[in-house]
């Protein structure tokens, strides 16, 4: 009987010791996880921009622009439309490749929404040269951002196919930016 009590007591002490010694360990993301998160956030920003710019030429349905300006806007929309399809294809191949993972601070999101609303109103309620200059300026800025975003992503990318895509996209966006800036000179 004394052995049973001793064994029972020892088991209780052991159980309490094990439960009492259990520690909650913080699980810190691995370097690979952080790298994938940063990559996906960058691609998500690029995808969001590319999606918007792929529809830039739709404004020309209701607004008039001189042929050289309309031509560059259509080139921008076409380039971005192709890039959008390629990014979506990357997502289909690799489900860890995310395109909708932007974690911008709330104030940044609100600021971007306010800018978009203001620019949209300015474009819709302007005409002639004023419209063309504003439209070209917004497109030049968008292509400049896209070119740099693609370059920075490409510098971090390890997948050779995506790396080549990003280098090509950066070059195309830089060319489109330069062409838009040239048109702003006249």
Predicted regions and their residues:
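His/Met- and acidic-residue-enriched segments that coordinate or traffic transition-metal cofactors
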Residues: 21-186
């Amino acid at each position: 009987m004394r052995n049973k009590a001793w064994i029972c007591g020892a088991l209780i002490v052991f159980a309490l010791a094990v439960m009492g010694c259990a520690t909650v360990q913080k699980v810190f993301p691995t370097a690979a996880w952080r790298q994938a998160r940063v990559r996906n956030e960058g691609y998500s920003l690029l995808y969001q921009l590319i999606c918007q710019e792929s529809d830039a030429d739709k404004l020309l349905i209701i607004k008039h622009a001189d042929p050289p300006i309309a031509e560059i806007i259509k080139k921008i929309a076409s380039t971005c439309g192709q890039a959008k399809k390629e990014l979506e294809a990357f997502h289909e191949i690799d489900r860890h490749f995310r395109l909708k993972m932007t974690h911008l601070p709330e104030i940044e999101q609100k600021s971007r929404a306010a800018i978009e609303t203001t620019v949209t109103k300015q474009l819709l309620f302007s005409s002639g040269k004023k419209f063309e200059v504003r439209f070209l300026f917004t497109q030049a800025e968008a292509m400049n951002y896209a070119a740099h975003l693609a370059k920075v992503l490409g510098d971090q990318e390890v997948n050779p196919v995506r790396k080549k895509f990003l280098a090509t996209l950066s070059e195309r966006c830089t060319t489109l930016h330069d062409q838009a800036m040239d048109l702003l000179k006249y």
